Amino acid sequence: MPSNSETKGRISADKGSKIKRSNSHAEDSIRVQPHSIEAEEGLLAACLIDGGQEVITACIESHITAECFFKRQHQVIFESILALYEQGSPVDEIVLHDHLCKSGTEDESGGIATIYHIQGRIETPAHANYYAKIVHEKYLLRRLIRTSREATEACYEQQEDISVFIDKIEEEIHNIS
């Protein structure tokens, strides 16, 4: 049988670990999710250079969607870039701004000042593939975080057969890539 001092030590250790977990959870809830504003702006800028057709095509082929962007303004801008591309319209800062105004999303995008800021980020689309890779990787990390949190919550509420439950979670994680 453990002595009273051993028991106190274990309780203290347990309390300490609970506090650590609690602090870790609190820290996790206030942490900023993975993203790279610089890569997002670089990729958007590359889409605006020389009509952006090659870069936009590469984005589509790489499964870059508006959801891949962390910043809401960037999502709105990329949605408009894709819409212009699908219409066969040229993509530059003036046509993009006009599209944002006509679609009622100018304010949400940050307007012409944001477009000019983004446009000034790079001078050549030469590194667009690298920017796209960074944007996509950060998006996948955010999806993994979200899926992991949802899986953790589901573990507390798990009611079904454990092997079926684990299979579902494995499938959700596998679907991220």
Language model: regions and residue ranges:
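Noncatalytic partner-interaction/assembly domains of nucleic-acid and motor enzyme complexes
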Residues: 2-139
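Interdomain "pre-motor" coupling segment immediately N-terminal to P-loop NTPase/helicase cores
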Residues: 120-177
